[in-house]
């Protein structure tokens, strides 16, 4: 799972802010 799937509140978003 990643930012794109978990949303901006996801811990994965930290390194993939562009997914938001």
Curated annotation (Swiss-Prot):
UniProt keywords (A-Z) are: Amidation, Disulfide bond, Ion channel impairing toxin, Neurotoxin, Pyrrolidone carboxylic acid, Secreted, Toxin, Voltage-gated sodium channel impairing toxin
- Modification Pyrrolidone carboxylic acid, positions: 1
Keyword Lipid metabolism on entry? no
Q: Could you tell me which residues carry Cysteine amide?
A: 20
User: Which family does the similarity line name?
Assistant: Belongs to the conotoxin M superfamily.
Q: What is this protein called?
A: Mu-conotoxin SIIIB
Q: Where in the cell is it found?
A: Secreted
Q: Determine if Secreted is one of this entry's keywords.
A: yes
What this protein is reported to do is described as: Mu-conotoxins block voltage-gated sodium channels (VGSC). Potently displaces (125)I-TIIIA from native rat brain Nav1.2/SCN2A (IC(50) is 5 nM) and muscle Nav1.4/SCN4A (IC(50) is 3 nM) VGSCs. Potently and irreversibly inhibits current through Xenopus oocyte-expressed Nav1.2/SCN2A and Nav1.4/SCN4A.
Disulfide-bond pairs as recorded: 3-13, 4-19, 8-20
In the record, what terms sit under GO molecular function?
Answer: sodium channel regulator activity; toxin activity
Its primary localisation, in coarse terms, equals: secreted
> Under the cellular component aspect of Gene Ontology, which terms does the record hold?
extracellular region
The text the record gives for the protein's domains is: The cysteine framework is III (CC-C-C-CC).
Known tissue expression: Expressed by the venom duct.
Q: Which residues form a coiled coil?
A: none
């Amino acid at each position: 799972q990643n930012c794109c799937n978990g949303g901006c509140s996801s811990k994965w978003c930290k390194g993939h802010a562009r997914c938001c």
